[in-house]
């Protein structure tokens, strides 16, 4: 039996207001997607009734859409998933509630779900409304610590098929004190390794420095750990690719997000790149510190 050819590549882009959905839609348009924003949900099935337009389609959907509600969107996702002609992906552009409130207060815009109330009430209402949709997402990008440029770069790694034909891997370091980053597929705790913080000459350096990496690598537990980690990830990547996944996100945490997690993320990223996988590296806490010394207008969020 010959399986039907998938005629449509369709990306549904949603998420809370202020998280960066419009930036995402514009970025996808720059990549060659046919973009339609705020299309009523009831019109979406009609979009794929005709012949394929020959390029992928991105649809922006949020609470401002006519006839939008979480139940209807989930029903639409189920319907499209079952359509053999459609290759569907759901992109959820997320953001922490505190950052969304900060953005609304900064721009003095009214929240669409609370036009006569505080932004905080609207943000809370919308996050609750979208919770069932969030768990159905194929891709989740948390823009809480991202600039528009960061978001566009991340989307390019995930959705620009011309940029890469293999599964893209992102590795990031973080501090457990500031919480585990959202949207990460696998997390590894590096706090069992020797901590360079207690070595005065290394304290102010970070895990990108060779002296810090050498110190951490001298821990007797590091060698076996890193070898098993590398082998595990290299084993998983082809399997993830076969399942149709376009992106895998790996998180590495330690106490301060400065030494151990940074070094391990750097070393693994380099190992994966040497094996031929597209890799991006991000160090959340180091970026926070760098952003803190930049002028305000350069610290604009997504």
UniProtKB/Swiss-Prot annotation:
List residues binding GTP: 62-65
InterPro entries associated with the record = P-loop_NTPase (IPR027417), RapZ-like (IPR005337), RapZ-like_N (IPR053930), RapZ_C (IPR053931)
**What keywords is this UniProt entry annotated with?**
ATP-binding, GTP-binding, Nucleotide-binding
Give GO MF terms, alphabetically: ATP binding; GTP binding
Residues annotated as transmembrane: none
Family annotation (Gene3D superfamilies): P-loop containing nucleotide triphosphate hydrolases
Keyword Repeat present in the record's keywords: the answer is no
Signal peptide (from-to) = none
Q: Where does ATP bind?
A: 15-22
Keyword Heme in record: no
**A Pfam family matched in the record:** RapZ-like_N
Which Cys residues form disulphide pairs?
Answer: none
Entries under PANTHER family matching the protein: RNASE ADAPTER PROTEIN RAPZ
Against HAMAP family, the record matches this protein to: RapZ_like (MF_00636)
Purpose: Displays ATPase and GTPase activities.
Q: Which family does it belong to?
A: Belongs to the RapZ-like family.
Q: What is this protein called?
A: Nucleotide-binding protein Rsph17029_0317
